[in-house]
């Protein structure tokens, strides 16, 4: 799973080149670890909610309020296209 987490981080950083701000927050203290990703299309603005939010568990488990790696990867790839 570490490779997939690094891939998500890389895509978040690439989004900046396209004018988007994608925040990547790793939380190791949560059971099994998780990554929260917040997407601001066309850049972050004060007092504006993100266009999209994802929470992915490092183990890849999907449950209520959690996204799969595949879902987040597909969204970010589309954002980078």
Task: Name the predicted role of every residue range.
Residues 1-36, 42-81:
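Negatively charged, low-complexity tracts enriched in Asp/Glu with abundant Ser/Thr
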């Amino acid at each position: 799973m570490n490779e997939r987490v690094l891939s998500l981080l890389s895509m978040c950083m690439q989004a900046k080149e396209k004018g988007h701000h994608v925040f990547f927050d790793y939380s190791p203290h949560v059971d099994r670890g998780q990554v929260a990703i917040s997407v601001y299309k066309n850049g972050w603005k004060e007092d504006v909610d993100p266009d999209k939010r994802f929470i992915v568990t490092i183990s890849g488990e999907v449950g209520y309020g959690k996204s799969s790696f595949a879902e987040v990867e597909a969204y970010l790839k589309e954002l980078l296209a």
